[in-house]
Amino acid sequence: MIIYNTLTGIKEPFIPLNVDNIKVYVCGPTVYNFVHIGNARSIVIYDVLFRLLKLLYPSVTYVRNITDIDDKIINVAQSNGQNICEVTSVYIKAFHEDMKMLNCLEPTYEPKATDNINVMINLIQKLIDHGHAYVDNATVFFNVESYPSYGQLSKRNIKELIYGSRVDIELGKKHPGDFVLWKPATEVDNKLMSCWPSPWGLGRPGWHIECSAMSYCYLSENFDIHGGGADLQFPHHENEIAQSCCAFPGSYYAKYWIHNGFLTVNGEKMSKSLGNVLTVRQLLESGVKGELIRYVLLNTHYRKPLDWFNMTLVSAQESLNRMYTALSSVNVDLSLDDDVELSSDVVDCLKDDINTPKAISVLHEMVTEINKTSDVMKKTSLAKTLIKTANFLGILQHSWQDWFRVNENDQEIDKLIDERRIARANNDFKKADDIRQLLLSKGIVLSDNKDGTTHWYKK
């Protein structure tokens, strides 16, 4: 297997620390809201990596944490008049439900930050004892100047972190790049039960120390792969390396670093101010199948930016329809026997830096072969291989009958679209526009194509 290692900046062969047990850590969600599709992209990509590693090696320990203590969580709890557990329990449950709908496997371990506070405190004390952290007014800071290799992941020079004389250094810091390991409790923390006793007083951990502590707790000082979104590369992952390597001299923390690219919506970064934050829950509740969302997320290479726009779903729907249509043409039982093998071409694509779009293109080549051949045995064999291989990628999870089952609402929508088409043909543009507006009021958006056909999707 070959993967692109952010740490070295090149694709390199994957050489495990121990071939009998591959160790992987991935940064999971911060549970203050429903997970958005950018978060979901990361979860789905590393789900495929997990599946691949399980295929290639006898044992894989996959740890994906949950950040359940954070400023954003505290803000939501305060606004809602709840404690942090009341907030996080709702969104942890929702996260699990949403990821199940995207056909994601459960990780081996899914630790919560609040269950590992003592591990964090012990790690912080180690850093203080080794001269890599200092206490100022009940706040513990990491001293970036104590770690000469700081910046190795993000390729930043520590001097770049000096912002200039016009920007004040945060109170208590010795260097602008120093970051918080432990912060003292506020009145709000006490009220919301978001603080714990420590040698430095009542308080709560900084974000970065959480992942260092949980990865150490479940994977030890060194492990094979650390994954996450490109937005976490700096400062989060850079700080993780610094903390962990300083707490355990001689360690290197993670051997391979994998980062998935950014996801935008209609060419723009998702943000509350733009009102374009798109959650998995919104898509599912609007009628978009989880398998369709997963297909879109896998159809762009994980390191490339992915722009989510309305026609993306239309195109993905057509692609999956093509696959299910091919399966519907095979008039035999397609239940899988144990001897049905995965497509080696697809596995090879995944072994080449998790190339999921190329793997999907191989699936479509198989569909073409199914459609071309009239040999029943060959068609059946190809169909079974297609199902087995697609299932490995987490798609084609339905029977073709279930996939194409149309509900009454869909039939009504298609009927209105047909009426609109006739109205346009008769130059009755007012009626056509009235139908468009009626559908829009029901959350149905129409997209007219150059060939005269019309696609629709739920916004």
Curated annotation (Swiss-Prot):
Gene3D superfamilies: Cysteine-tRNA ligase, C-terminal anti-codon recognition domain, HUPs. It comes from the Bacteria. One of its GO terms (biological process) is cysteinyl-tRNA aminoacylation. Zn(2+) binds at residues 27, 211, 236, 240. It is found in: Cytoplasm. The keyword rRNA-binding does not apply. Binds 1 zinc ion per subunit. It catalyses: tRNA(Cys) + L-cysteine + ATP = L-cysteinyl-tRNA(Cys) + AMP + diphosphate. A motif ('KMSKS' region) lies at residues 269-273. Signal peptide: none annotated. Its cofactor is Zn(2+). Monomer. HAMAP family: Cys_tRNA_synth (MF_00041). This is Cysteine--tRNA ligase. The gene is cysS.
